[in-house]
């Protein structure tokens, strides 16, 4: 019996990246007191009105097949949300409803690339991106960013990575894992490179509502880049509803029919009651959204203060999102080695930086998904391990 080549391409791209997290979960399930900072799942409650809408919609019979592109009222809500954000009109014909950001990214890639094409991705990158590109059959090409530049990708670095086979640039702003938020000038410079080489831009914007001081900018919000951009997002993070799997792709209306063909092959519609809830999430103002953003910022500041005097750990304040990358290179360990020792010796689960590409080497990623008191305790344990390692090395 033979399996399809896609399974070979995906083998080794998933489970190994999450091994520390999986072990932390296993131990927590056995009753050990593990501080889990290894996954980005908001810990604060979602807006009650969104939950109530999903429940009432189910009771009202909204459990049948939905439209392939999305329910009309849902598409209107998403289009209005994006119009209000940018100031430029977005119509429902420019929107596809998806089962979360991951499904939206997969749909976009399967629509745009094939075997032989190349997809450029700033490194570090979200852990699933390699698998998404591999599933499409295209070649994954990392583009270097530097810690001293706060992991901001440059137009020149992208230009240097382009070949005759390059088809797509996959951006993520704010970035998971780095927290980098691309500025308008950076987006415009990158966009000029993409225009010059006729590249598509897929932009993962799931943390768009979680910037701190730097304003959010999407290439889809820039009129000269809109026609080549597919903006992908969801309410998973902003509204603390990752289990709803409710998201979208926004792009030129001529692309939507192609995206819909791929989406229907995978899902053949979604859950109308979830789509109704998404419409409420975007149509109404919810204090929980701002409360979540402020909580992550306050926790990030707590973490930065915890390592301000450390000679073993370097921490940079993220510009957005719900993660911080800690530089542990002074300990002489890789991020993965440090993460395993931290779990085994101090009961704290974090993600190794190497799970996010070569650019994450010597780093660990901290999720800001626990209250500040617990986060400070975890920081104390991280600092203890790092200082012990440095003392031993000396």
Task: Name each model-derived stretch.
Residues 2-6, 10, 18, 27-36, ...:
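PLP-dependent class I/II
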Residues 65-66, 290:
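Short, surface-exposed loop/turn segments at secondary-structure junctions
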Residues 14:
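N-terminal binding-site loop/beta-alpha segment at the start of enzyme catalytic domains
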Residues 37, 60-64, 77-85:
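Glycine-rich loop-to-alpha-helix module at the N-terminal edge of alpha/beta enzyme cores
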